[in-house]
Amino acid sequence: MNIVILGTQWGDEGKGKIVDMLTEDVAAVVRFQGGHNAGHTLIIDGEKTILRLIPSGILREGVLCLIGNGVVLSPPALIEEIEELNAKGIPVTEQLRISSACNLLLPYHVALDKAREAELGTKAIGTTGRGIGPAYEDKVARRGIRAMDLLHPDQLLEKIKKATAYHNIQLEHYYHQTPLDYQSIYNQLMEFREKIKPMIGDVSALLGNLRRQNKHIIFEGAQGSLLDIDLGTYPYVTSSNTTAGSAATGSGFGPLYFDRVLGITKAYVTRVGAGPFPTELTNEEGKKMAKRGNEFGSVTGRPRRCGWFDVISMRRTIQINSLTGIVLTKLDVLDEFAKIHLCTAYRCDGEVVNEPPFDQSLLESCEPVYEEMPGWQTSTYGLTDYSEMPKEARNYISRLEELLGVPITIISTGPDRKHTIVRQAVFNQVITAKG
């Protein structure tokens, strides 16, 4: 069985924990888009691990972890991550494979990203400054350096020289930044080459072989659907396609081979950086939500904006991803709220609408229409049995299912792998559904 697991909001939904939990009986986990601009946090027996590029299956012995062609790969970030995991006794090089068609994220991409954000000032998009956007620009413009280029040093030197000269024109003459030295970039890549060369290969062919052996494969998305470059809250989006279609194009795996698509969503909503956020809470409730949920970026440390669950945007996410199931995370964050609110419509220019407008100027003016429900005001932290959950919490979950039309198959009640209620088996492995 082949399953896509992705975020349904603006990222930070808890994908890493869920992927890790489900990898017990899978052969491989695949990253198919994004870069090291988002982190997946795993907590196992109290020990925290943050992954930025390497798929979340790396903590399971024998699980292949594949970086697909849709990822933009920062060599220094990857090496740092490998060394951190090796220090914990995890044999990364035995489990990790990198698509030879994967584009590399290089120093001039980072320099351009930072220069552009500085130029925009208060109108900045709010990128992480890690060079993701410029790296994807080079990919689309067909001047990108790919992992396979590391296997041909002489050709690589000429490509680096041309690309650096091209980007230095912008850096030096438009942004008034110090130009970069192509030889230094090349020398650095040669050092990385020796460390990652054995892991470079044909990920698409490897996936094909696993499929023919009827192995279970998870395709792990980064960020969230509302950050999709085409279907998200443009221009306040990331530079890749974060929706289910990207799992095929970003890995070289045919779309008809996918069996299920699981969407990860928090029991509330968060967002990092600029952009419209209809249900955002800027009052004490929002601060309480952020504090209880420890809402700070795992990579950047930036505080996240918080708000009530948005049914309208979630319906759009279900539609564009063809979700077959929902995983609800961080339910325990709502434990102390006396009242819970669900946004069931928007009021835009005096008109009640049930679809989120793509026009961002209109979306920014939309106000949420709320349905109020009683809170449970008792701890759900660490629960593993649905029948032990407070009635009000179960009512909240039932109402979400009713409004969304998709079953909530898994509920996360805490950060650890064990803090989980499985209501419906994902693979064919034996899992006792609770409730």
Curated annotation (Swiss-Prot):
Kindly provide the name given to this protein in its UniProt entry.
Answer: Adenylosuccinate synthetase
Its recorded reaction(s) are:
IMP + L-aspartate + GTP = N(6)-(1,2-dicarboxyethyl)-AMP + GDP + phosphate + 2 H(+)
Listed EC numbers: 6.3.4.4
One GO MF term: adenylosuccinate synthase activity
| Pfam families in the cross-refs | Adenylsucc_synt
Q: Which gene encodes it?
A: purA
**InterPro entries (alphabetical):** Adenylosuccin_syn_GTP-bd, Adenylosuccin_syn_Lys_AS, Adenylosuccinate_synth_dom1, Adenylosuccinate_synth_dom2, Adenylosuccinate_synth_dom3, Adenylosuccinate_synthetase, P-loop_NTPase
Residues annotated as binding IMP are 12-15, 37-40, 128, 142, 223, 238, 302
Q: Which family does it belong to?
A: Belongs to the adenylosuccinate synthetase family.
Instruction: Copy out the cofactor comment.
Output: Binds 1 Mg(2+) ion per subunit.
Q: Which cofactor does it need?
A: Mg(2+)
Pathways per UniProt = Purine metabolism; AMP biosynthesis via de novo pathway; AMP from IMP: step 1/2
Where is this protein found?
A: Cytoplasm
**Alphabetized CDD domains for the sequence:** AdSS (cd03108)
Which keywords appear in this protein's UniProt record, sorted alphabetically?
Cytoplasm, GTP-binding, Ligase, Magnesium, Metal-binding, Nucleotide-binding, Purine biosynthesis
Upper lineage:
Bacteria, Pseudomonadati, Pseudomonadota, Gammaproteobacteria, Legionellales
Name the residues that bind substrate: 298-304
